[in-house]
Amino acid sequence: DYVKIHPFSYGTESKFYSGGDHVTFCTVKGIPVSPLICYDLRFPEIFQACSYQSHLITVIANWPTPRRCHWISLLQARAIENQCYIAGINRCGSGGGLDYSGDSMVIDPYGKIIARAKEGQYLVTAEIDDNIVTQYRKEFPLKADRKPLLYSQLYQCRK
């Protein structure tokens, strides 16, 4: 049911695909999860929206090796900003003239990489402790300080 929110204009996806207009939530072994796709990683707002319900956000991607540093840094930033687990599942190998490093990983709510694939094709597993998300959000209620109405007004000023 989920559709990628942000087609990758730089790669001409937006010429062939329309972006989605909603996010999807599901529960896996009692943990609320949101799936996002590739380029969505560059838009922190969508992660904020998902993290109100989800304790794990997955990002399935085709991030090429030249942007490997962005992939890793943004995954860690999204975990820290949203105080949740992030699972980044990235393509590996080559195709269409591009190389893909893989670098699939799981990051905890503190930004620590708790499981990581080496370069190439690997299975990554990690323990996801839902209580850590709940406890961390209770101890450091970051979302209580957000100002969504102000952010909305600031976006309107740009138009």
At which residue positions do the language-model features occur?
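Active-site catalytic loop in hydrolytic enzyme cores
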Residues: D1-Y52, P66-S73, Y100, Q135-L142
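CN hydrolase (nitrilase-like) catalytic-core segments centered on the catalytic cysteine
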Residues: R42-V124
